[in-house]
């Protein structure tokens, strides 16, 4: 009797590795592979500072991210090899208060 080997079909899961900036608060860099910054422009890396590992995250099956649009992250990773998440703009509490007072 002859054995038949059936190859396993492996889907390529999309992961990202997220690094925190050592120079800029609330700034994060998403890359495809751990410690691989080869596709990130040198000028960006210089301004970003020493990357500090924040987390590794699977993107497949995920519906959303906390502070970034999932589809934009996936597209940026596949097209340019990185995604830069900048901090949200600061709230102008005085302006909000003055507009609510009228």
From Swiss-Prot:
Which stretches make up the YcgL domain? Answer: 14-98
Note the InterPro entries from the entry: YcgL-like_sf (IPR038068), YcgL_dom (IPR027354)
- Per its UniProt record, what SUPFAM superfamilies does this chain match? YcgL-like
- One matching Pfam family: YcgL
Superkingdom, natural source: Bacteria
The record's listing under PANTHER family reads: PROTEIN YCGL
Q: What is this protein called?
A: Protein YcgL
**Organism from which the protein derives:** Salmonella agona (strain SL483)
